[in-house]
Amino acid sequence: MASLIYRQLLTNSYTVELSDEIQEIGSTKSQSVTINPGPFAQTSYAPVNWGPGETNDSTVVEPVLDGPYQPTTFNPPVSYWMLLTPTDAGVEVEGTNNTNRWLATILIEPNVQSEERTYTLFGQQVQITVSNDSQTKWKLVDVSKQTQDGNFSQHRQLLSTPKLYGVMKHGGKIYTYNGETPNANTGYYSTTNYDSVNMTAYCDFYIIPLAQEAKCTEYINNGLPPIQNTRNVVPVSISSRSIVHTRAKANEDIIVSKTSLWKEMQYNRDIIIRFKFANSIVKSGGLGYKWSEVSFKPANYQYTYTRDGEEVTAHTTCSVNGVNDFNYNGGSLPTDFVISKYEVIKENSCVYIDYWDDSKAFRNMVYVRSLAANLNSVMCPGGDYSFALPVGNYPVMTGGAVSLHSAGVTLSTQFTDFVSLNSLRFRFRLSVEEPSFSIMRTRVSGLYGLPAAKPNNSQEYYEIAGRFSLISLVPSNDDYQTPIMNSVTVRQDLERQLGELRDEFNNLSQQIAMSQLIDLALLPLDMFSMFSGIKSTIDAAKSMATNVMKKFKKSNLANSVSTLTDSLSDAASSVSRSSSVRSLGSTASAWTEVSEVATEVNELTNSISTQTSTISKRLRLKEMATQTDGMNFDDISAAVLKTKIDKSTQINANTLPDIVTEASEKFIPNRTYRVIADDEVLEASTDGRFFAYKVETFEEVPFDVQKFADLVTDSPVISAIIDFKTLKNLNDNYGINKQQALNLLRSDPKVLREFINQNNPIIRNRIENLIMQCRL
């Protein structure tokens, strides 16, 4: 039997020659090279003196409320509100373009009957009739004239409790506030040469950018924050600030502090992040109507763009976390459309984008502080993916969308095909968007999120613009470079080879002929015949077998043997013959970890499904200990492994040990085992399903957990190559006699080959499904 290879590995993996150990130690010593660039790297700590810390820079961040400033005459910048804070009645502000607009604002106290008052406007004494009927609110009145010798007339008015007023030059107009607080709004006066209008303020004032107009309106209606109304806030001259807003440069390298050996550099960079999603769509075996998986996987993308006249080469890796698993089952027939699992990212998911470029900011990224980033959001809509069926209309997964919003940035290491890069990892939170997604020609519709079927929607990439800033500790001499503290490039190169080999192995599943597979599964494969397909010398094959045994020694299968060996000797005596469910705990101890039994044995709430699943996970070793003439799952697993090794073009001495060990653990994860007692069969799977039925009629009977536990201890355990559902389907559609049923129950390879040679679709579909489960 092909599974002999696993038993040989279990037996021989504990014997390692001393010379091999010495060689391995010597190899490890020679490959672990430590580079000592100085005392800081040697101790793995940064220098104690980090410099002055954060440096304030008022040219980058614009304040919302700038001031207060003393009364003055000046030309305010365009698109900035002057928020006036008068204290006494009278003229508060005036401005003119000296051509066709003279505009001033007068403050009138509450409860003033109509009377004539004298005001000084633009250097002249003017008589104006004013009034304020409100008992509590102050009144601000705009007065205007269009010629130098004309008369002033009253225009818009504002009744205000906070006693605040605003005026702004913008878009060929002069804007002011009017109405009544707390519902005041803006109005305007058209003015030529508006940008040259000088304003004279007779009270303290603040300056607020147009982008914060909503905040200015809030102050007009409700008053300034309390902190602005204390004696600690002292107005200063307008000359103390520069109104001109200086934009940050796309590339900024600023020396924060410097000593003889080290300096702190602040790197500010405008960046363009381009990324794409990758996916994996795996079709199940059978007649072509079923898919086992539609999932996301990490995607690398390399590109160039221009920043401040300089061409930048960048590399990104996009990955997702917190995916949601969905499935669709159109029925139990072989021709029913089924997707066992398809992944969707939603609000509870995260998207990570690792970014690197070839600028100085990424050269010495060992000690970093003050890392910050500001990125735009981006919407990612899903496309249409058609599931090609052999016959009939294709189901189409269509729609779905999410938006990515920046949620933070950290340091990371990004692995390309050949080198590891110090990178920035940008984390994005998600929000679902319209439209919803659906699977056309099925009942799946109205679901939200982005499915993995076609996440890029025929676009080459998505793009996000933004900026990051960090302070990095680097050598004062720019010719020096600090090394990566723990280099993992060699291991990552092996991981890359393993990743490519896994992909190749998984793609080879559809090229395996089932009749040849069964013949190969019946051969007593040993290590030499297993690896004979690899083009190498005998010495290399011997070394390869030794490396495989060393790796296999640490596998989950090998680790389970010692635990099982200790408990098997006590299994029979520890079984209680009581019919209660609780008594199963002592029997299960032979097939479960001791720690699991200790927590489960006293829990009456354990369901039958949980108990059978716990036992069935350990039945693989029980089956190995009581080998039968029937075919088992490990025979198929080893035969598939042998076939793929022979077909592979990328297998080598470095990757083979990992592949063999992974295959022993991951091939055929969903296994079903059975025991036979007279005319009754008890069957349990690793996912918790269980059946009990009669051999002749396939009629289900109640599942007796205690009986199953007893039979597991005393009787041979058989791999259910053809499980109960397949047997029942075969009997219902074709009809089988008792002898055929018994042969299939015992997994007789001759009978299996006969059904496959007859091209029986039900048996072929089951075997193909097992082959497709042989994935890494």
Swiss-Prot record:
Disulfide bonds join 203-216, 318-380. Keywords: Capsid protein, Coiled coil, Disulfide bond, Hemagglutinin, Host cell membrane, Host cytoplasm, Host cytoskeleton, Host endoplasmic reticulum, Host membrane, Host-virus interaction, Membrane, Outer capsid protein, Viral attachment to host cell, Viral penetration into host cytoplasm, Viral penetration via permeabilization of host membrane, Virion, Virus entry into host cell. Residues 510-776 are annotated as: Spike foot. The record marks 101, 190 as: Binding to sialic acid. A motif (KID motif) lies at residues 644-646. Residues 248-479 are annotated as: Spike body and stalk (antigen domain). Residues 65-224 are annotated as: Spike head. A motif (YGL motif) lies at residues 448-450. GO terms for biological process: permeabilization of host organelle membrane involved in viral entry into host cell; virion attachment to host cell. Belongs to the rotavirus VP4 family. This is Outer capsid protein VP4.
